[in-house]
Amino acid sequence: MITYSWRTTLAGAELGDVENLLEQAVEYDAEAGFSTATPAATGGGEVHHLLVSIAPPGERGSVALDRLPDVPVVAYLRLDVRGDVADVQFVVRPEFRSHGVATLLAELLDEQPTGWSSIAGVRRLRAWAHGAHPAAERMAGRFGAHMDHALFKTLRFIGGSRPFVGDEVGAAVEPAPDGPGEMVEGHLAGIAPGERSVLARGRTRLATPVGSVLVGVDEKDPAAQPACVALDPAGVTAGDLRVLLANALLRVQADGARVAQMYVDALSEAFVGASRELGFQHDQSDLLYVRPL
C-alpha cells in the first residue's frame, strides 16, 4: 500500500511536496497543538529525510483509501542522528490519518533492510509527542517505546477582573535577543508554530538575586495573545521559583497581558509545585518517547 524512500537532502519538487503536507497539517492541527516537522532546519548531526508515498486511487486495496486524494507524499519523517541516538519528527497528511499509515510504516522500517537498519550506528530513537496526540501512546506501547520525559504547557489568567496580586522583587531588566532555550533537548524542534510564536515573545530578562526569568507580550495585541514566561528551574529552590514567577506575572500583567503561558518540567517537583501555587493551570502535556532498536 505504501512505499518509502530516504533522502539526505530535499530540494525542488520534493521539498515543495513536503512543505505542502506540513502546511496542511499545521492548519488542521492548530487547535490541538500537535507536532510538526522542520525539513529545512539545520541539524546538529547527520540528517535523513523519509518520504512516504501511497499507490494511486484504485490500487490501494480499500474503498476508503481510494477516495482520498492522489498526492505525491502522504507522510514525512525527519531523522537527526547524533552518535547512536536519532531524533524523529514525523507527520502524516491529515486526510490519511486513522488509515494505518503510521503503523504500517513503523512495521516496514523494522522489518526491511532499507529501514532503520540502513542508518548506520543508530540504537535509539527519540520522538516528542506535542499535545494529546491520539496515536502516540498506542504506537509507543505497540513498538516498545517508553516515556522518558514530559513538559506541561500551563496557563495563568491575569489582569482584568482577576488580577494577579503578589510581591514584586527588584529586578534588572535586560534584553534577551535569543529568547528561551530548550528545557529538554529536542522539545522545540517539532513544536507547533503557534506555540513557537508565544515562546518567541520571551525577549526580556528579569534578573534578580535569586535567578532570572524571561518574559514578553505580543506587541500588537497583548490582551488577546498569550504572554511568554520561561525559566530553567535547574538549581533553583521552590521558594525562589515562586519569587521569579510572581515577578514575571506582575511584569506581563502590567504590559497588558490577560493570560501567561509557561512550560513546566514535569519531573521537577519544585517547579510543578511552585507553578501550581502561583495559579498556573495545566493545558497540555508534551511527552518524550524513547525506543531502543
Question: Which residues fall in each region the model found?
Answer:
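Generic low-polarity alpha-helical segments
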Residues: 18, 50-52, 101, 154, ...
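Short amphipathic alpha-helix that is part of the acyltransferase structural core
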Residues: 1-40, 163-195
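Conserved donor-binding loop and adjoining core beta-sheet/short helix segment
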Residues: 7-13, 22-122, 126, 131, ...
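Hydrophobic multi-pass inner-membrane translocation pores used for secretion
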Residues: 183-207, 211-293
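Acyl-donor-binding surface of acyltransferase catalytic domains
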Residues: 82-85, 96-170, 244-253, 258-293
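Short, surface-exposed, charged/polar-biased interaction segments
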Residues: 4-7, 39-46, 146, 160-161, ...
